[in-house]
């Protein structure tokens, strides 16, 4: 009962702060529109058989909608256009994305709730050849990236000598490695740990993680009322143990 009263208090407080906020519209429409790619295991995955979403971020968004007292609607998005979806008002919020200066130019970010490192993936049979980050930085090496991801930008920084090959979703960079069309790719340590289990022919380069990065939800830039509400909600959920429970559920460990 106390939780319900507290949630109502938060909603009324922030909604009254700015009647033109996304928060006010979400409450008025009774629906939270969430942009998500559905291709990032275990954060957001779309089951092609049922067209339903599941994952860490999906559970987070369902909980947010529940506390707001509204329905949740997942809007399909692609990495190359996920930022544009926020600016074009196709959705009210996104599932987690990496906070980058480029994205922050046009979109707002909530407080962060997950931190990860970046690692390279190669074929296990090539692990002796590509045992370090530096071994992949070679003019004879092809590094695959997925168009629009933060890893696409990181690859340019980490591998200036290598050939970079961008693929467009629904294709994924690691699939190029599996098919032998690329020597490696980089991804979050979170996804990499899942991929090497799902595809035992892949291996993580054992040279350590680089570039610690933070995940957050994207919201419309300049909408402080909506951003403040969601950020306050995230912090409250951290304190309540909600995120800790989800980390255990999905066998994750934030840095």
Task: Locate each region found by the language model.
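Ligand-binding clefts/hinges and TM-proximal coupling segments of bilobed small-molecule sensing domains
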Residues: 21, 150-165, 204-206, 235-255
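Alpha-to-beta junction loops
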Residues: 32-33, 69-71, 87-96, 140-142, ...
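A ligand-binding cleft/hinge motif common to bilobed small-molecule-binding domains
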Residues: 81, 97-105, 153-157, 175-211
